[in-house]
Structure formats: C-alpha cells, structure tokens
Amino acid sequence: MDFISASSLSSPFSTQLSPIYLSSGIVSLKPRHRVKNRNFGSRESNNKSRKIVPIRGCFGFSGSFLRSKQSDYGSEAVSESLRLCGEGNELVLSSEYNSAKTRESVIQFVTKPLVYALFCIAIGLSPIRSFQAPALAVPFVSDVIWKKKKERVREKEVVLKAVDHEFSDYTRRLLETVSVLLKTIEIVRKENGEVAEVGAALDAVKVEKEKLQKEIMSGLYRDMRRLRKERDLLMKRADKIVDEALSLKKQSEKLLRKGAREKMEKLEESVDIMESEYNKIWERIDEIDDIILKKETTTLSFGVRELIFIERECVELVKSFNRELNQKSFESVPESSITKLSRSEIKQELVNAQRKHLEQMILPNVLELEEVDPFFDRDSVDFSLRIKKRLEESKKLQRDLQNRIRKRMKKFGEEKLFVQKTPEGEAVKGFPEAEVKWMFGEKEVVVPKAIQLHLRHGWKKWQEEAKADLKQKLLEDVDFGKQYIAQRQEQVLLDRDRVVSKTWYNEDKSRWEMDPMAVPYAVSRKLIDSARIRHDYAVMYVALKGDDKEFYVDIKEYEMLFEKFGGFDALYLKMLACGIPTSVHLMWIPMSELSLQQQFLLVTRVVSRVFNALRKTQVVSNAKDTVLEKIRNINDDIMMAVVFPVIEFIIPYQLRLRLGMAWPEEIEQTVGSTWYLQWQSEAEMNFKSRNTEDFQWFLWFLIRSSIYGFVLYHVFRFLKRKVPRLLGYGPFRRDPNVRKFWRVKSYFTYRKRRIKQKRKAGIDPIKTAFDRMKRVKNPPIPLKNFASIESMREEINEVVAFLQNPKAFQEMGARAPRGVLIVGERGTGKTSLALAIAAEARVPVVNVEAQELEAGLWVGQSAANVRELFQTARDLAPVIIFVEDFDLFAGVRGKFVHTKQQDHESFINQLLVELDGFEKQDGVVLMATTRNHKQIDEALRRPGRMDRVFHLQSPTEMERERILHNAAEETMDRELVDLVDWRKVSEKTTLLRPIELKLVPMALESSAFRSKFLDTDELLSYVSWFATFSHIVPPWLRKTKVAKTMGKMLVNHLGLNLTKDDLENVVDLMEPYGQISNGIELLNPTVDWTRETKFPHAVWAAGRALITLLIPNFDVVENLWLEPSSWEGIGCTKITKVTSGGSAIGNTESRSYLEKKLVFCFGSHIASQMLLPPGDENFLSSSEITKAQEIATRMVLQYGWGPDDSPAVYYATNAVSALSMGNNHEYEMAGKVEKIYDLAYEKAKGMLLKNRRVLEKITEELLEFEILTHKDLERIVHENGGIREKEPFFLSGTNYNEALSRSFLDVGDPPETALLSAPT
C-alpha cells in the first residue's frame, strides 16, 4: 500500500536536479537509532505459514487429532490492462471499452480513478513550506527578481490520505514549528527582522523534534511491555497445556493396561480440546510477534526517521540562508573597493559556473530532441519545456541587468571583456582552466544567474496550474481521458522493461544484480516491491513487483554516482515516502552518536546477553545439570529414607487416601493422580535405580545429607535475616525490653571484666575514685530552686550545716548525720539533689561505683576497699561519698551460702563498722540513691547509720508551677513567660516528673510557632541573609537599643511574634499528660468519613457538651471533636472535673454534684432523640444510661439521698451483707430509684428542649469543622440565646407526682436482683 509522506515530497526530478548542498553523504545522514523495518503486507501474502505441531504427535497419542493446515499462497497474476503507475497512483481500468456508452457514462466511469490519480499527483508535486527551501533552493540571484515577485506563496496544508501511517500527526506538529522558521526567514530576508531570530526558530524546531521523538519512543516502550507481558502469559499457558498432556498420557497408559475404553475416549476428547487451545495460543503468539515487529519498524522507520530528516533539512535551510546573507553582504561592498577573490572563493565560483554551464548546455539540447530519452516520460518533457521557458526569461532578465550595470559602471573606465587563464597552482580539477573577465577600468563585475531563484518561487504556482489544467481537461474531454489512461498503462510496461534491461545474473557470485543508475527510476515509477539494506556491507537487495528474485545493488557505487543529489540517504527517504517496505538490518553505530541513557542501556544489555550466552554454553549447562541432578537425588533419598516413612507412620492410611497421598489398595477404591503421588512415584523410581543397599551407599548418604542440611540451614538463616529487610518491613521484631536487658547485662559484664583486668594490672579502684573527686559549683538544679523538698528542708539544712562546720555539732553534743539515703523514682531528681547539697555545702564529691568496691581477686578484698575508701575520705574531710543505685551492692544479707555472697556480706559488715565510727572522725557523709529502700539491708537503715532518708515524691501542683516557671525563664523568651497561665499548665501535667516538666515550656513555645501561618519563602530569604552577614555584626552592636528595636520590628514583620491568645490556644489543646499537639492530628479514616457517618457521633458529642454548659457550677468542656481514625469513627469530648468553687469539694462529692452528674448522663441520649430521625437511634449513650442508673441507686441505697430525703442507708461496701427487708420494702426502694432517675431525665429533657436551636448549631459547626473549643461553645450559646440553669439546682424540688415509667415494677423478682446487684 503506497502513501505520500508529508516529510518527503519532491518533484519528479528530485533525484536528478536536487541542490548541491544536500549532498551530505551517507555519513552525515546516518540515523542515530538502530532501525529495523519489515514488510507490512497481509499474512496471506507470505509464501509460508507457521505450522502448529499437534500435541498428540508430540506425546505419543494415537487418536485422530486436528492438524494445522498449511495454506498455499501464491502471487496473483496481474493483468496488463489493470496496472497503472505504482500501487498508490495506479488506475485500474479495462483495456476494452464499449463504444456504445454515452458521454455521461464514460465521464462517470473515469471520474473516480482520475480524481484519485490527480489527487495523488497533486500531493506528490505540491511542496511543503518546511521542505521547500532545502529541497529546491539554488544559488541566489539579484534583488531584481525579489522586487518583481511581491506575491507571497501561500502555505497549504497537505491532506494525507487515509492510508497514511500513524505518526503523521507528529510530523504535522513538527511542520507547524518549521512553518514558523520559514516565516522568520522570509521576514529577515525582507530586512524586517534580525538574524538571531532565525537561530531561535531553528532551536525551537530542534526542541520540538526532541519532544516528539521522546513521545514516540515512550509510546513504543509502553506498547512493547504490554505485548511482551501478554506473550509471556500465553507461553506459560502453552507450557501448562504440555504438562497436562503429559499427565493425560500417563493416565492413558494406565487405562490402556486396565482396558477402560470409555475413559480413553474421554481422554481423547480432552486432548483434542487441549490441542485446539494450544494451536490458538501459538497463532496468537505469532500475531503478537508480528505486531511487535511492525510497531518497532513503523516507529523507527517512519516516525523517528521523518523527524530526523525534517530537522536536518531545516539545518541545511538555515545554512543556505546564512550563505545567502553573506553573499548579499559581499555584494554590498562600496563601489570604491577593489574586488579581490581568494583561492577558495575562486574554486567555489568555478564549481557553480560548471554546474550552471551544464544546465544551460544540456537542458536545451534535451528539450529540442524529438524523441524523449528512455528515462523521461511526457510529464518530464513538459517539465523540461517549462524550464526552457524560464531559462529564456532568465536570459532576458540577465541581459537587462547587464545593460543597467554598463550604464552605472561606465564612469569607472572603459569596458573590457576578455578570457583569463587560471594559473596552474590555482586550477581546480574538473573545471575550466580559463574564465571570462568583465572589467570597467579597474573594477571587476560578476553577473549572477537569475533562473534559479525564479524557478524556486514559480515551482508551487506551476504545480497548482498543471494540476488544475489536467483535471479540467480529463473531465471535459472523454477521448483525451481514454488516451491518457492507455498511455499510462503503456508507460508502466515500458518502465518495467527499461528497469529489467538494467539487470543481469552474476555467475561468479550466483546472484542477480541491478545497475545503480536504474534504482532511482524504479523507485520513482513505484516498481520496487520491497528492499533490504545492509549498511555494514554497503549493499541493498531490492525485489520488483511481480518477481520473486532479489537484485543486488552496490550502495558505494550509487553513492559515488549520486553524491551531488543527496546520495543514498535521499534514495532511502524517497523509498519511505513512496511506501516501499524497507528493512534496515542491524549495523554498527558509533558510541559518540548515542546519549548517556542509550550507552547505559547498551552496556547493560550487552552484559546481560553475555551472561545469557555463558549460561547456555555447554560447560555451564553440563555443570548446572550435574548440580541440579545431585540436589534432586539428595532430596529424593532424604524423602524416601526419612520423610515418606515418617508421614506414613504418623498419618493413617484412610486419611492419606482421602488427601490424595496414598494409592488405593482395593479394586473398588479409586483416587486421582495428585502432585504428591506423582512426586512420590518419581522419587521412588530414582531412589531404587541408585540404591545398592551396601555400606558404602549408606555412608555416602549420611555424608551428603549432612552437607546438604548444613548448607540449607545457613541459607534459610541468611534469608530469615535479609529477606524481610529487602521486602520493606524490616527484620523480625523481638521484645525490645529483652534486647535492652541483654545489652545492659553485657555492659555490666564488660565493666566487671574491665575492673578485674585493671586490678590484675595493679590499678587501685580507690585511688581512681578519688582522682575523679570534684567540687560542684554549678549544679543542675540549685538547692533553693528545688520545688519538691519543702517538707525535708530542715533535715537537708542540717546536713549542709554539718558539712560546712563539723566541729559545731561536736561541741554542741548533737548527733551528726552519718549517712543520707535519697529514695525516689526515675527522673525525680535524686542525683541533682545530692549535687545541690554538695554545692550548697561547698564540699567535694567522690563518686563511687558499685563495681569498684565489689570482690576482686581474693576473698575479703571488698571489705578492704571499704576501709581504704573511708580512711582516705577522713583524711580529706569534709567530703561527700556519693553512691548511685545503692541497692545493687548493699542488699539484704543471709540469703545465700555461696562464697561470693559471703564476701558480699563481709563487705556490708565493714560498711556498718565504718558508719559506726563517725563519732571519732567527722566531716564525711555517705550519700546514696535508690529506687526501693526496702531492698537495702535493715542494719544500714537503723538510727545512727543511714537514718536520714529523703523521699522525693512527685511534685505537687504548686511545685510543678514553680518548676515550670523556672524552666520557662531559662528556655523561653522573657516576654512570653508572663503570658502563660502556669497554674493551668501545672494542672494538665500531673503525672510528669521534674525532668520532663523542664521540657514543657520549650514545647509550648515551639507549638505556638508551628500553629502560625508564615510566608516560608520570605522567611528563608531573611534567614539566608542572617546566616551570611551575622558574623560581620559585632556583639556590642546587637545589644544596643536600636538593634533590639529593629529586631522586634523584623519579627513583627515576619509574623513570628507570639501573642497571649496563641499561647492560651496551645495550653487549651494540651493533652492530659503534657504532650502538646496542634489541634487534633487525624490519620487516614478506616471508613468513608461522610456527613451521614459523622452525624450520629456529632449529635452524641453535642448533647454532652451542651448539657455540661447549661448546668451551673459543673464540669468544664474544654474541647469537642470528631475522630475518624478510630474504629468506624468516634465523637470525643474533653471535660475537666471541677475541683474548686463547684459542686465537688476536694475528693468528696456532694449531693448537688451527683444530681448534676445524673442530669448530665441523659444529655447525649435526649439529643439523639431530638435530632436523629425516628428509628435511627443508636447505642452510643448506653454507657451513660448505665452510669445514671448506678448513680441513682447509690444515692438511694448508700447515701440516703432519695427523693423523700430519708436518711436510711440500706447497703454499704464494707458490710457483711445487705440489709434484710421484705418484698414490699424492696419495691419502695425501687420506686425511689426510679423516681429520682425519671426526675433527672425530665430535667435534662426540659433543658435541651429550651435550647434546641443551640444544640442544632453546635452539631452543624461540629460537622463542618470537626473540632470546637470552649470559646467556640460559649460563642454559640451566646449568639443563639442559650438559657442556662441557675443555682440552686436540686432534683428533689421538682414537682413530681408519679413515676413516668414502671419498668422496675413490671415483674416481681427481677427488680430486687437489679436493685441489690446494681454497681456501686
């Protein structure tokens, strides 16, 4: 199928009259990609079709199977009367016409083929603007022609035929960019633009070409991946069918031995179905291969090749235009200058002169011949006549130009016209050695030729006129149409004979060859059926239509003959434009022409191919087969000798038979063949074929099994460690506490070993400890700032006074402190307190570790260490001996009899002796820390020894406030410290330790900054300036008032200043344990978190919040939000219990508070009744209803707060049993509980009904924003006119006559059980 590509349209004489600057040679137009094309003819055109080998024949089946048929395809005979020029331009018409047909019938008969032919000819002859300049441009002429030709050549979009290839859109898109380049050239040529604009337009063409080429290749890669994936799936399915056929074959052999014919017939049918499916699969695989090859060929040969050609033509066009501008600038030299040509310029002018001489001498002779040359048809003759006419016009214009030149140049001197011989050193081979000189005095004039430029601008107009005239003549004159068709048919046969006459058979090479001169003619006449190109051998094989022979063409010879007309690349592009299937075999491409990505892919693919080749070599294949065979043999031996017998012993026979793991033993039993039985049978055959049952075999079996097990164990161990990490979920997790324990244990073992090594080396631990002795000047927390020691302040001052003046205690006869034990949990500040006491007393501290005092190389060394420690300390008194984790080496004595433990007890005894001896030597205090003082030996805790025990508890609220305030002064901006309500912060940090409280102020400030909206780009720009010039500003300048003022202004400008509202907002959002979060951070919800899903939860939360706001002096609602990340979403309310000024006094609950709590429990339940549609009630309020029943029961039975104010208490938690009472009295108690229960329900219902608008507004805003604060709730109540309750708030004062519900009294015994068993 032929088509005309928009990227390669040319004139009929494009191969003979192409411009010289297109002769770039085969090297310059070498494609940058490997191109592999294929003939895209139909599958019926192939001489051979693929045979699908029947499955039955492969596996030995004897039944009748479907066999794939081989179709015989032959070339159809084409009648001479039905052939027209080419596939695309051929007109099929019968050679005999009926003379009786009317004029209208004849016109109707020839209209359609003629219009089709004319359309194709018009498309073939119409130039495209993007390729007009490089295809037909010739050396320039003077500006006279430009002034006469003011008509602009209109751009006409080439409408491609329906049979065009799929990449024509990319070509059109690139041609649109090329049209911009051509317009730019025209503008610059008219001196209305700059030359740089041409370069920019060319760059735009290159960029667009790269973009389009990338799109084409990405589409190709995507299609290739999809098709190859489908092909792999089909291959796997085919392999599976083969495996199934093998299994059916084995079954048929078994059935054949048993004589079961019916089952044999069923197997035969199954095999037929499988064979049919197998054949279809391979047919589909062939189709996929064809599609893959077609897509690759089409993409690379058409899409990419056309884009590359367009880009190169544009580059040549720009080069030609630049030469034209240079030549114009050369002509514009002032008249006073003397023309002096260089040697290279003379050579170029001689080349142009020879070319123009040949054109002017040969073409007129050709046109004057009566018989047209065999290579020219009538169209070519008409074209030559037109060229002759243009040459005559050119000569006339040239004579006029010479006359005008004579008039202007007479003033320079006498006219001289003579022939000058070129010197031998400057002569160019192949050109005349003499040239004509035209001189006016000393001025030389060179007259250019005008025909080239005139032909260029008249080409398009001539095409349009010729096409219109031919079409009109064919439609009007029927006889002319018949004659035209007959001539075309005759011309086709004549063209084929001419081409065949240029072929011969080379007996030496045993091949048919074709003259390279005949190839362009055969291509232009569309006589070539297909072509194969081998660039590495520089040959081409062409096949003519209707002939099965391939003709050899020498590309090198062709390149030499047509070097000036584009060479072989021009021929290749013309073949693509004519739709000739051309396949380019793989060839060597220089690495310099490949991009980095292509070079990387080339290296990787080459390496992959090399490894595949090595893997398929005989040596590697034999080694691989040997190793796999050995592994299989070992597996079979282990399974037969160990695994299969164990399985048969453990699993009963009946169970194995049902699982398909055993063959039937009875005739009536049947079982299908399973993979297990197949594996067992193959393993048994393999095992029996190698088992010799001698000692040597068993010995080697044990050796092989041991080696195999060792390797397999380490492989699985490696995979267990590495595979999870590669998959992305890390190694198998163990208990972190156990891992931490082993690390700590290893550390202590290392320390103990290290101490023993030092002792062996003669290192004294006591000397080492005193070498580390230091005075504490700046403790972590000064003693005056310690907030949790108010109750122990007097004892601590006593210890400090003793250390400062030990003699004062001795003179007064007071008992001096001998040992101090600081007890507290981790993080309470035990070590900080010891250092603070040392700093306050201004005495040194000796830090002793437990491992340094323990037993060493001999028995009793620990006691000696203690004696030496205290002796040295007395010499250096006053001093503090500080021991951390005192319970590690001062534990309870008498639990063990081991020698090591006995030495430990001697260590404690010596420590007791030293503590008792303090009366003689003062100024030494043993200060130790521990978490559990009960683990220390009681003798050490008796009076007179370590009797000063400081218990560090969790700080109180006031102490936490002081700790927070002190930490804020150190870490926060001083201006922000007073903006925070530290009392409120201390209430929310109850469970935090002092060391954690110090981090809260910094977290508050950072969270406040995170909640602000900042301009990140502006902030980063300022930060970069600060980082660059901060070292230039001196420190004294920063401390000035002006610098501080400017800093504050800059902070305000960047929005970094924090206000009191920002800090209060952060404090309100603090979590109960001191963790600060900027609002509620939600994860991805587990369900679709829509408005319908959120509505029940929002109603539940809004009811709780509103009832809390309406009750006076009750708990405070701080936050209200919806949490979609919980199970199916959840509504949340954060309510803080009142601790002062309300209904709860301390830890005791008043009657008023319990009644308010009872009313509060009905808030969410009543809200759901009011806002949810009937029947959509849920169980979200069930826990609160249960809580209300519990409160009502406790008020009546335990507290005596019934509706009748009876003080009788009927149940106590510490009583042996409940108060005995009759059934009637129990009914009365149940009635009281129900009465107060219903009173609370009615009270809550009335409150919410009066504030229904407020409830709806809270629900609506909660659904919209998903979070509301206490301020938001107060605003909603105020804006919507909420009605709050006032004090006194009592349920017993409500007018109530009879209980609304008698649910407790409907049945006899159950109310008793419910009443007495109610949770309290």
UniProtKB/Swiss-Prot annotation:
Chain positions recorded as ATP binding sites: 824-831
Membrane topology: Multi-pass membrane protein
Subcellular location: Plastid, Chloroplast membrane
Any single Pfam family the record assigns to this protein: Peptidase_M41
Membrane-crossing residue ranges in chain numbering: 571-591, 633-653, 695-715
Cleaved signal peptide residues: none
InterPro entries: AAA+_ATPase, ATPase_AAA_core, P-loop_NTPase, Peptidase_M41, Peptidase_M41-like
Disruption phenotype: Embryo defective.
Quaternary state and interactors: Oligomer.
Listed name of the protein: Probable inactive ATP-dependent zinc metalloprotease FTSHI 5, chloroplastic
